[in-house]
């Protein structure tokens, strides 16, 4: 042998050498080759004979080591010989004689076989080509419990696991038939063999208990076609001789750790909580999808008429515990998961809580390895399952098993659920919440592949593995292929768990032999999940074992009914509409979980489910349950709706609410959510009756979620009242939406409550989609919707309660600067809802509210009234506090001066204007109009609405007009995200009243920026512009200085009961604290600067354009309607900057001018501009610029008497209502033309004028600063002592707490004044083309308003001089009374009155206009910044004003520089504002009016036109 072995090795070199010489094959080489082949063959056979150890045989899978084989052979031969010698020596001779007949054999032939089998620890069997067991050794009983007789002549497939059929077939068939791959005669493979059930199992079957099939993993060493047998005859030519032994434990693949999650169900089987902590900790890929699919599968499978989940739940309730059979489902990546649910009935001994069912769901991902927990894989549905666990391709080559084969073969291993069985006994009662979770193809995967699911098949012979009919609920993925054996087993019921649908037919597997291991790689798994749109939330599983893609069931193998069912279910799954499946009513609720909710559940399951384990978790869940009870008390009382949305079931909703609450806390929504919960609970209990809830539900379910879903605050609750529908459903939808809603996504637009509007409503059934609805914003323009007051009969009380108890908290929350956008969204919702509610009230009801508010004449009452403005929430919620002053309910006229308290019937005219806005309650002056939900305003409606609303309140028409400002078409949009409600309430002193709503408007200066105005309409337009322009001009039909306090008082229509002074002050202080504290407010007011700088502050007011910017953002301090205008006047350029037309130009005298133009800005100080310097500046500017009339047509401001000469009374002119778009267009054209023509001229003139004005202003400012400092100090003291009940000047100075930030409601006077575009702006009038806006005499109503508000004719001569200067040009426009009043108050004198004409009806003449004007101006000014000439002029002018009030100092010249484009407006406005401010306190009302007029002319232009002008300036 040695030479023979060595010869080939030596022959190789010879061959290589000869190959060069010999090209053709030689006989010698052929002989050598044959010898080598034969030698290798003999060595192989020798190895098979010598090596009895299977492990050694396995080692032969690779090329055997010849030397090792020969060595072992020699060794064994020697051992045998030595053994024989020893035995012979020990035996007696007699014995030798006795045994001589046996020859020399050491072991008897009969005993050799059993001994060998015992040594091998296995049994021996022979299978012919047909798969029948020809022979089996007797010791098979030790392994499979079957007797030899039972298995003889039976099909081997009856005891083989379905998943191993294909593997066995590959070994049985001749190698020519198996993939054409040659194979050794002997080979080893693994398979699972059925263990005969115990007798106990038989008895259980009779009891209806399905036995769990048990499989034993066996390792088979097979020899096919042995030559010795083949030679003897043909019978056994193709037989397979096998020795089977148990797979050693050490050799068995370690199954991946099982995954589990717990659910908690109520007595109806509805899932109340879900805990996925353990799964989340494992972070295996697709665990969320696994949870969803598990719950879906468990609830979707039916056994006859009852679902398995329901049957399981009933068993738990009956016995206290239950264990479900194994069921299977597939993940999106094709991984088969075997699941089992164990539930126990838990009773709490520590409290009276009702018992609940705790369920533990144990999940095992099937591996593609044959030996892996085969019982787990196979147990799921009995033998019907086709677990493709064996890694060998043979599994995939599955051949059809005999139909008679028992499909219930169970693996020897019971599917062990991690944790005690008690825990396993989780109630599988419908998992409502989770049932809806991502109804993906999990149902498809549900086809049970595990055999553990006992299919009442007694013996393997019993029946075909196939199911006779498709399982009604089993959703077989098209990839799943049913084993032929399983296909028609008559024994197996079509139970949802029946593996039949899921069985993998060996044949089908053969076709997909290469696919059994699909996605074994974790990365592949993740990729597929991603490709299928179900990206794994967790990192992909590291163990590919569980992902065996054995579930390759082809639909072709399924029964037609199964396919049909699959199709229907799959379609449902795709939509996540399990609720529609024919589950029990409760089942539907469980499965009704929406996909979105499922996502939420997936995210929140861990948090919620954490509490589900053990009774201790019950205690943990108490808080959540209480919260649910709190929020859903009414819903619990109501019967569940039958609508699909109700399929979720109350528990579903509750669980969702819990999830939402949990997730919110996790997402840092906790604080706002708590407030929401409180509000919701209170609203639901106090304000919503079943009828109201039904209405809400009707809206929600009928078509779209109403704004209730959009609104996060009590307003949403109000919405609930208004909306009719099934109360329970709606309520749940609303609660869930509110709880789940992301505050950050809320916008005033979302909040603007058009309760009656179905389009704004979200269908509760779409609650899972609420997240999308949340994000969605309502259109800035809302159609006018009138809501009957009957719906809001209880609204007043509710709102009062909310205001007194909760609004302050909400406001304080919303007033945080950083979070103001989010919180203000809530506040906006609340206020808008309240506003709509109030609008829904009859006029008489609103009047009553106004009266109530008026009765509370104190600042607190005003504050309450402002709170009452909640009804005004139709306005952008930026104007939250604007609504505080009932003025918000009225057209938002900023005309109401801080001190002007004279109610004016003229307001009604504005109110009528507001009526045009839609839902304007003309009957209830101001309030109604304001309260009415803002419809999408037409371009011309914005300004007009504000003006119309403003006069609504006879006593506080101005304030009301302000509200309209807020209500500008963008009312639906939050005017200013940063605006804070509470501080505004504090500002409700007379000045505060004007200023509070005004300030709110101003503070939220960027309202318009935030507002979603039509593209052609500058955002600032809608709310603030109106407010800014009109207030100061009586001619505009809005009370220029109608008592702000009165207006505010009227505005609080929403809150019937006046808020207690203490409460209001507390709220205000809370808001102030939120705003960085009183010190911040002081700094904003400029009090420290005033004290330290003295007159320098006055100069700052002029010099600092920042105040304008502040105004643009949200001048919080514009208590005075004119304060904003003053700001604009000073920083008139800056207001131009802010597209929102914040302050037209702050006058140094207006503390408000320091108001923050942008939501994030705060007024640096409240310094009143000196009217004298301002007047001079304005006069110079106006004269130099030839009083350009471009602004007048734009503004349509009756107040446009910007160039007011001291001796000349300005007459307000009203323009006919002009569309905002038209105004914007015209303004843009005018501005562009004017800018082009006058840029250079104006720049030069402005520079000269600015120098002169600066000198004059410095002198005037010094005087004014002294007065203003005194006033401001006094106001600061008042504000601190009275909770920001600051004098108008203080308010105007921007010292008002940011709480006033809440966007002012643009007060557009009803009147639209056709002033020249430059009217009151000091900008040279544009060419005649601007004549369309040529000033039109104010309508009598506007005049009456302006007169009444201005009616004190208290204007100083200086103011009159200013008015005169302007009046020369604009004199006819401006009413003498108005002039006087306008200049009466230094601060308010400058307060901007939104130009009704420009702003439209929404630009009442309330000083609050300034915010809008500020916005508009700021936007306009910003836009106008495009004009460098104006910019320089603005800069020069602003620089001239630096000595002005500190508030204005904040409005630093750089702002003017920024507002270069707006310079012509700003310069004019600022001049006007300055001149108006020059009058000082004596000018309070007139100053405000004139200031506003000046500002309004400027501001009005920006207000109605500037918003649009702003863009044009940009274009210029």
From Swiss-Prot:
One of its GO terms (biological process) is regulation of DNA-templated transcription. Residues 508-518, 551-560, 1299-1311 have a biased composition (Polar residues). A motif (LXXLL motif 1) lies at residues 628-632. A motif (LXXLL motif 3) lies at residues 735-739. Belongs to the SRC/p160 nuclear receptor coactivator family. SMART domains: DUF1518 (SM01151), HLH (SM00353), PAS (SM00091). Keywords: Activator, Biological rhythms, Developmental protein, Nucleus, Repeat, Transcription, Transcription regulation. One of its GO terms (molecular function) is nuclear thyroid hormone receptor binding. Pfam families: bHLH_NCOA (PF23172), DUF1518 (PF07469), DUF4927 (PF16279), NCOA_u2 (PF16665), Nuc_rec_co-act (PF08815), PAS (PF00989), PAS_11 (PF14598), SRC-1 (PF08832). The keyword Transcription applies. The gene is ncoa2. GO terms for cellular component: nucleus. CDD domains: bHLH-PAS_NCoA2_SRC2, PAS. Residues 1-37, 386-406, 457-518, 532-601, 700-727, 775-795, 955-979, 1284-1311, 1324-1350 are annotated as: Disordered. Transcriptional coactivator for steroid receptors and nuclear receptors. Coactivator of the steroid binding domain (AF-2) but not of the modulating N-terminal domain (AF-1). Required in a nuclear receptor pathway to suppress expression of dorsal mesoderm genes. May play a role in the positive regulation of the circadian clock. Residues 1341-1350 have a biased composition (Low complexity). The keyword Transcription regulation applies. A motif (LXXLL motif 2) lies at residues 680-684. This is Nuclear receptor coactivator 2. Residues 1324-1340 have a biased composition (Pro residues). Its main location: nucleus. PROSITE patterns: BHLH, PAS. Residues 23-80 form the bHLH domain. It comes from Xenopus laevis.
């Amino acid at each position: 042998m040695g030479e023979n072995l060595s010869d080939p090795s030596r022959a190789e070199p010879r061959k290589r050498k000869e190959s060069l010489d010999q090209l053709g094959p030689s006989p010698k080489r052929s002989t050598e080759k044959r010898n080598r082949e034969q030698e290798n063959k003999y060595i192989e056979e020798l190895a098979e004979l010598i090596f009895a150890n299977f492990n050694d045989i396995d080692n032969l899978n690779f090329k055997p080591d010849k030397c090792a084989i020969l060595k072992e052979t020699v060794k064994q031969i020697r051992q045998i010989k030595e053994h024989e010698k020893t035995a012979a020596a020990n035996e007696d001779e007699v014995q030798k004689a006795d045994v001589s007949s046996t020859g020399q054999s050491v072991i008897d032939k009969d005993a050799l076989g059993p001994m060998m089998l015992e040594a091998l620890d296995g049994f021996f069997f022979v299978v012919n080509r047909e798969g029948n067991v020809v022979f089996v050794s007797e010791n098979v009983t030790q392994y499979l419990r079957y007797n030899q007789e039972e298995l003889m002549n039976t099909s081997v497939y009856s005891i083989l696991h379905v998943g191993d059929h294909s593997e066995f077939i590959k070994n049985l068939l001749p190698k020519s038939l198996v993939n054409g791959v040659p194979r050794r005669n002997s080979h080893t493979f693994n398979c699972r063999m059925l263990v005969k059930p115990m007798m106990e199992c038989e008895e259980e079957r009779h009891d209806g208990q399905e036995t769990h099939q048990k499989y034993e993993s066996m390792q088979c060493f097979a020899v096919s076609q042995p030559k010795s047998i083949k030679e003897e005859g043909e019978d056994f030519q193709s037989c397979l001789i096998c020795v089977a032994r148990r797979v050693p434990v050490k050799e068995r693949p370690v199954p991946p750790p099982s995954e589990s999650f717990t659910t908690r169900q109520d007595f109806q089987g509805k899932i109340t909580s879900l805990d996925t902590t353990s799964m989340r900790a494992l972070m295996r890929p697709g665990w969320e999808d696994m949870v969803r699919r598990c719950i879906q599968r468990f609830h979707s499978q039916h056994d006859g008429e009852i679902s398995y989940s329901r049957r399981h739940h009933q068993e738990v309730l009956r016995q206290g515990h239950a264990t479900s059979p194994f069921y299977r489902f597939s993940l999106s990546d094709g991984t088969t998961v075997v699941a089992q649910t164990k539930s126990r009935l838990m009773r709490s001994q520590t409290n009276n809580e009702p018992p609940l069912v705790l369920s533990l769901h144990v999940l095992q991902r099937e591996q593609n390895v044959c030996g892996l927990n085969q019982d787990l894989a196979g147990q799921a549905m009995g033998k019907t399952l086709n677990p493709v666990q064996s890694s060998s391709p043979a599994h995939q080559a599955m051949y059809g098993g005999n139909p008679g084969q028992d499909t219930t073969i169970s693996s020897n291993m019971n599917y062990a659920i991690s944790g005690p069985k008690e825990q396993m006994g989780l109630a599988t009662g419908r998992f409502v919440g989770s049932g809806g979770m991502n109804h993906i193809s999990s149902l498809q995967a549900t086809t049970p592949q595990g055999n553990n699911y006992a299919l009442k098949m007694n013996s393997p012979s019993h029946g075909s593995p196939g199911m006779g009919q498709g399982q009604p609920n089993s959703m077989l993925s098209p990839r799943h292929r049913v084993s032929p054996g399983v296909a028609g087993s008559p024994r197996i019921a079509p139970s949802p768990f029946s593996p039949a649908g899921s069985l993998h037919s060996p044949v089908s597997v053969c076709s997909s032999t290469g696919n059994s291991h699909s996605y074994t790689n974790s990365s592949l798994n993740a990729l597929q999940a991603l490709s299928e749109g179900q990206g794994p939330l967790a990192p992909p599983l590291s163990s590919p074992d569980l992902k065996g893609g054995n579930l390759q069931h082809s639909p072709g193998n399924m029964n037609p009914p199964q396919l049909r069912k699959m199709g229907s279910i799959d379609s449902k799954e795709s939509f996540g509409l399990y609720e529609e499946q024919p589950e029990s009513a409760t089942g539907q609720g469980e499965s009704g979980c929406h996909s979105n909710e499922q996502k939420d559940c997936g995210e929140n399951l861990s948090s919620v489910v954490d509490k589900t384990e053990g009774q201790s978790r019950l205690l943990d869940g108490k808080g959540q349950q209480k919260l649910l009870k709190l929020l859903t008390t009414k819903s619990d009382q109501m019967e569940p709706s039958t609508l699909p949305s109700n399929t979720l079931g109350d528990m579903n909703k509750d669980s969702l609410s819990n999830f939402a609450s949990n997730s919110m806390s996790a997402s840092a929504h906790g604080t706002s959510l708590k407030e929401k919960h409180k509000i919701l609970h209170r609203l639901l209990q106090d304000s919503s009756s079943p009828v109201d809830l039904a209405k809400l539900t009707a809206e929600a379910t009928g078509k779209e979620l109403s704004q209730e879903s959009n609104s996060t605050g009590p307003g949403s609750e109000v919405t609930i009242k208004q909306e009719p529908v099934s109360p329970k459903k709606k309520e749940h939808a609303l609660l869930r939406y509110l709880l789940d809603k992301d505050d950050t996504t809320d916008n005033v637009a979302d909040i603007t409550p058009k309760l009656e509007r179905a389009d704004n409503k979200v269908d509760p059934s779409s609650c899972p989609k609420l997240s999308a609805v949340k994000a969605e914003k309502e259109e800035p323009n809302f159609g006018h919707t009138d809501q009957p007051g009957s719906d809001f009969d209880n609204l007043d009380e509710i709102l009062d309660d909310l205001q007194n108890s909760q609004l302050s908290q909400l406001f304080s929350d919303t007033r945080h600067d950083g979070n103001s956008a989010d919180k203000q969204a809530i506040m906006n919702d609340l206020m808008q809802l309240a506003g709509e509610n109030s609008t829904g009230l009859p006029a008489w009801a609103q009047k009553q509210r106004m009266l109530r508010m008026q009765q509370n004449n104190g600042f607190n009452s005003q504050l309450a009234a402002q709170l009452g403005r909640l009804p005004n929430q139709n306005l952008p919620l930026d104007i939250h506090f604007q609504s505080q002053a009932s003025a918000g309910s009225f057209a938002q006229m900023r005309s109401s001066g801080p001190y002007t308290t004279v109610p004016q019937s003229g307001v009604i005219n504005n109110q009528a204007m507001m009526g045009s806005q839609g839902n304007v309650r003309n009957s209830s002056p101001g309030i109604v109009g304001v309260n009415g939900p803002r419809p999408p305003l037409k371009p011309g409606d914005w300004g007009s609405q504000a003006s119309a609303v403003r006069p609504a309140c006879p006593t506080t028409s101005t304030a009301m007009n302000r509200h309209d400002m807020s209500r500008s078409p963008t009312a639906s949009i939050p005017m200013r995200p940063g605006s804070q409600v509470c501080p505004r309430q504090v500002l409700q002193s007379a000045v505060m009243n004007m200023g509070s709503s005004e300030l709110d408007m101003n503070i939220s200066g960027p309202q318009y920026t935030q507002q979603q105005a039509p593209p052609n309409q500058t955002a600032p337009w809608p709310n603030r512009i109106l407010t800014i322009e009109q207030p100061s001009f009586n001619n505009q039909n809005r009370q220029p200085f109608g008592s702000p306090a009165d207006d505010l008082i009227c505005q609080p229509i929403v809150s019937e009961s006046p808020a207690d002074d203490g409460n209001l002050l507390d709220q205000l202080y809370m808001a102030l604290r939120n705003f960085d504290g009183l010190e911040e407010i002081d700094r904003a007011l400029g009090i420290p600067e005033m004290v330290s700088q003295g007159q320098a502050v006055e100069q700052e007011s002029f010099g600092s354009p920042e105040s304008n910017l502040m105004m643009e953002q949200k001048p919080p301090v514009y208590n005075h309607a004119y304060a904003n205008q003053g700001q604009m006047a000073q920083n008139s350029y800056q207001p131009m900057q802010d597209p929102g037309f914040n302050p037209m130009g702050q006058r140094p005298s207006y503390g408000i001018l320091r108001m923050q133009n942008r939501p994030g800005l705060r007024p640096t100080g409240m310094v009143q501009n000196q009217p004298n310097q301002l007047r001079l500046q304005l006069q110079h500017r106006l004269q130099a610029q030839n009083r350009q009339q471009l602004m007048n047509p734009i503004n349509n401001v009756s107040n446009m008497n910007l160039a007011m000469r001291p001796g000349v009374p300005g007459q307000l002119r009203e323009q006919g209502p002009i569309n905002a778009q038209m105004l914007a267009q015209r303004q843009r054209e005018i501005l562009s033309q004017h800018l082009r023509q006058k840029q250079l001229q104006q720049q030069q003139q402005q520079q000269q004028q600015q120098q002169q004005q600066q000198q004059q202003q410095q002198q005037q400012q010094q005087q004014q600063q002294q007065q203003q400092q005194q006033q401001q100090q006094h106001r600061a003291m008042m504000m601190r002592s009275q909770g920001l009940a600051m004098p108008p000047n203080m308010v105007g100075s921007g010292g008002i707490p940011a709480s006033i930030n809440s966007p002012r409601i643009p007060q557009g006077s009803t009147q639209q004044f056709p002033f020249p575009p430059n009217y009151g702006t000091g900008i040279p009038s544009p060419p005649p083309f601007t004549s369309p806006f040529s000033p039109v005499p104010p309508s009598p109503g506007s005049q009456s308003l302006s007169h009444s508000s201005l009616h004190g004719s208290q204007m100083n001569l200086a103011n009159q001089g200013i008015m005169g200067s302007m009046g020369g040009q604009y004199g006819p426009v401006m009413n003498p009374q108005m002039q006087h009043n306008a200049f009466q108050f230094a601060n308010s004198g400058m307060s901007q009155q939104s130009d009704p004409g420009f702003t439209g009806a929404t630009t009442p003449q309330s000083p609050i206009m300034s915010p809008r004007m500020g916005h508009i101006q700021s936007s306009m000014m910003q836009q106008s910044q495009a004009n460098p000439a104006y910019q320089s002029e603005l800069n020069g002018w602003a620089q001239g004003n630096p000595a002005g009030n500190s508030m204005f100092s904040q409005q630093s010249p750089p702002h003017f520089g920024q507002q270069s484009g707006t310079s012509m407006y700003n310069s004019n406005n600022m001049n006007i504002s300055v001149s108006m401010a020059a009058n000082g306190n004596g000018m309070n009302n007139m100053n405000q009016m004139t200031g506003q007029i000046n500002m309004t002319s400027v501001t009005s232009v920006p207000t109605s036109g500037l918003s649009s002008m702003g863009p044009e300036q940009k274009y210029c």
